A protein has these predicted regions:
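Charged (often Lys/Glu-rich) extended helix/loop segments that serve as interaction or gating elements
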Residues: 260, 267-412
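Active-site loop/helix belt of alpha/beta enzymes
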Residues: 147-292, 383
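Conserved, mostly hydrophobic/aromatic
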Residues: 33, 58, 82, 114, ...
Length: 412
């Protein structure tokens, strides 16, 4: 059962949010955020001598949510890929020195911002170093390695392998560090991120093994010692009832055995860095949306006020999100497509979904929208973006106001 299923059954609570703040609205559960942070940090602390969590701010940059993570685990850092994400980290109370900055095809202005803020700069290519040296050099640097393979729940979120635009091929990675050494840099990290949404523990074993074998090769050839090794993120969550969540305790125990086979002196071993996003925030958030129309055509369509402008993942990746009727689930089911109000036929939140009978005005919940939900929402058809609400047991507060049409045109 979904961890927030009981909340979705509370029709009084969610109707109250909808009546006060309108629909569609993103709703996040504070307790679930804290549970996810604790589950990850506890598994790491039991198995690794030194580790650092950099929350992937791209997944959801709302500072109110990041502050909950920061309060739960004060040492948390940020995985940033733009100046805006550095700003979000600072706004949330995270010092940029605890953040890793990984751009790709970076502009000089982006590099200047990351450098001036004191982020741990992770470069995507050897040419990035050429751009960086024109504006300044940090004391420590890392490079993103592409190990030649990747994996993800959808092809569009595989970030390693021969088709990926990211990282330096493993066969060229030594030269990147050699170039950095020639510029006088003496402190180094190594980073790799191969894909997102993975639920197979063996995949992470394969990734870490590839990173470690290359780390040893680089260290021996160049006579350097890595201060940290980041295996990125990519830890998936179950988006469907038949999917099984990652067992962090078991997985990090297995990964630590591989890690300390390579670095047997735990005290001097590089710190393990992670860059999780979905595994912290995805299942904490859902969208409440109101049924606006019912159509019997060649198919049965349920029109709702949340569309691809609200949640882009189904249209972009073919992603599937669980949906529930708010309140009493009911027994009668029909097969329907859920569609928004956008003038594109790809505007489907769900397709051929068996669902309880609905009436106009009913509320539905679109689950697991906490990651890459609001952060990927947009204004197509000049639709204002949703409000965001933080739920703390039976109380709630608005943490982002609903955008207005006037807001959209305020910079024109």
């Amino acid at each position: 059962m979904h961890p927030l299923r009981e909340i979705i059954k509370d029709k009084k609570l969610l109707s109250g949010i909808a009546d006060l703040h309108g629909t569609p609205s993103y709703v996040y559960d504070k307790d679930r955020i804290k549970e996810n942070v604790a589950r990850l940090s506890n598994a790491l602390s039991k198995n690794f001598e030194n580790f650092h969590i950099c929350y992937a701010i791209k997944s959801n940059s709302n500072p109110h949510l990041i502050r909950v993570m920061h309060e739960s685990f004060p040492n948390i850092g940020g995985d940033c890929s733009s100046p805006g994400e550095i700003y979000a980290a600072e706004l949330s109370g995270i010092d940029p020195s605890k953040c890793i900055y990984t751009g790709n095809y970076e502009s000089q202005s982006d590099l200047i911002e990351a450098l001036n803020k004191g982020c741990n700069i992770n470069l995507d290519d050897i040419t990035s170093l050429d751009r960086l040296k024109k504006v300044g050099l940090p004391e420590r640097i890392s490079f993103r390695m592409n190990p030649g393979f990747g994996g993800g729940s959808y092809s569009g979120i595989i970030t390693g392998g021969r088709d990926a635009k990211f990282g330096i091929p493993a066969e060229k990675i030594v030269q990147a560090y050699r170039n950095a050494m020639d510029l006088g840099i003496k402190r180094f990290g190594l980073q790799c991120m191969c894909g997102s949404g993975n639920l197979d523990e063996k995949f992470f074993t394969e990734v870490l093994s590839a990173i470690l074998s290359n780390a040893v090769r680089i260290e021996k050839e160049l006579k350097i010692n890595f201060e940290y090794i980041s295996m990125g993120g990519g830890f998936g969550i179950p988006y469907q009832d038949d999917q099984i969540a990652l067992n962090f305790d078991r997985m990090f125990k297995n990964l630590s055995e591989i890690y300390y086979e390579t670095y047997s002196d735990k005290q001097s071993a590089p710190s393990l860095w992670l860059e999780p996003g979905k595994s912290i925030i995805a299942d904490t958030g859902f969208i409440i949306s109101r049924v606006t129309g019912l159509k019997e055509s060649y198919k049965n369509f349920v029109g709702i006020d949340a569309g691809m402008e609200t949640l882009m993942r189904p249209a972009l990746y073919g992603a599937k999100h669980r949906m529930y009727k708010v309140g009493d689930h009911g027994n009668n089911e029909i097969t329907v497509d859920f569609t928004g109000q956008i003038c594109e036929n790809t505007d489907r939140i769900a397709t051929d979904r068996k669902f309880p009978t609905l009436s106009q005005g009913d509320l539905v919940a679109i689950m697991d929208a906490g990651a890459y939900g609001y952060s990927m929402s947009h204004n197509f058809n000049t639709r204002p973006r949703s409000a965001e609400i933080l739920l703390d047991k039976s109380s709630f507060k608005e943490i982002r106001k609903r955008e207005t049409i006037e807001d959209i045109f305020s910079l024109c």
